[in-house]
Structures are given as structure tokens and as C-alpha cells.
Amino acid sequence: MKRISKLATSLPFLALSIAILLSGCGTIHRVNSDYDTTIGKKWKTTNVHQDDELKGQLSRVAVLPMFKGEYDHMDLSLIEENIRLELAKLGLFEVISVDPEAMKELFAEERFSSIGVLPAQLIEKLHARYALDGLLFLDLSYFKAYQPVGIGIRAKLLNSDSGKLVWAADEIFDSSNPEVSNAARKFYKRESIIAFPLQNTKSVLHSPGRFSKYVGNSLFSAINLQKS
């Protein structure tokens, strides 16, 4: 009977403790959300070429494996995947990921640069396999894994029917640039603070993986499909 009595008296205290803990988590989340702010200009991707042919022409776009150039010795699969996922999340096209194994099977090479020599039947073979109407090349032009992290991407989108370049962007996202860090933190606050409520938005500037999500979003948000 004494054990039951002790348990009964401890239950209100336990309930109160849980309530305090839960309210504390809510407070931390609110503090991060309300007060973890950025001041100043936010970077926007502006080094962009877009042809009018892009609007309303492409619905199924294949993304080729990212050409890593001098960074080919690094495993950047997470960064590559994050950039592709950010394109898919924008809902601009149906995004088809072409894996390196498929490229090697078709062309004996896993990756091609958008500014290099391409196989003569690249578009034809990929169109036959994936029924695509657009082809996106990605080149990693700059990468810095340590603070301040940085990622440079050159992207080129071709109309697979005409072979014409319909969109291109070439940007270096350097987190030491205040405008870039502000934009990255704002993106992280909007997209990730619910999943990681205890983390300050500055953590996006310390992780190439998290930073790459911002890079993909900023880069592909520059695609304008609105008809004038």
C-alpha cells in the first residue's frame, strides 16, 4: 500500500515535469523561429541565360551525373543527390535521375562536362531509354568542405528535340559572402527548422550537405516557366 501511495503522490510531479519539458522545447523552437534572424541583402542567382523556347516546352527532364572535374576523387554523392532533389521539389518538370552505371553502359564514361566533347549519339540514346524532352548537365566548378563552405555549379539544360540550349546558370555560392550566408540561413529556417528545432540556422553554413540544399534551391529557382 505504501508503494501505491508513493506512486500516486509522484504522478502529479511527473506530469508537471513533462509539461515543463514540452513547453521548454516549444520555447526553444519559438526562439529559433522568431529571433534567429538574418539582417541584410539575400543572394539571388542572377548569372542565368534563358531562351523563350523553355517555357511550356519541357515536361520530362533527365539529370546527368554531376561532372566533378578536379574534385573527382571525392565522394560527393550526398551533395549531388541534394541538388537533384531540390530541382524535383520545385515541381518544374518530371525529373529523371540518370545514374553513373547507366551512363557507363551507354557511353563507356560515367560523367560528361557541359563544356567538354560529348558523344555523338548522347541525346538520341538517352531519349530512347528515358523518353525525355530535356537534358540537364551539372558541373561542379568549386567546392570547399570546410568553413566557410562553398559550392560552385555550372548547369546547362538542353531541349532534346532540337538540341538547343534553353537555360543555363553558372554561380559560386560562397558562405563567406554575407548575402549568400543570409540567403542560406533564411532557406534553412524556412525548410528545416521544424525537423531540427534545436539547431541555429548558422549550422547550414558549417555543413556542405545542408548547404548544398540551399544551392540547389537557389540555382533552380532561377528557372522561369511563367509565360509572358
Task: Please provide the spans of the model-predicted regions.
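Bacterial N-terminal signal peptides that target proteins for export
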Residues: 2-14
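Bacterial N-terminal signal peptides
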Residues: 12-23
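C-terminal/domain-edge helix-coil "capping" segments
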Residues: 25-57, 129, 148-150, 160-228
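N-terminal segment of the mature soluble domain
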Residues: 58-65, 70-135, 218-225
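Soluble periplasmic/extracytoplasmic beta-strand elements of cell-envelope proteins
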Residues: 60-65, 135-139, 152-156, 168
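Solvent-exposed loop/turn segments connecting transmembrane beta-strands
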Residues: 70-74, 142-149
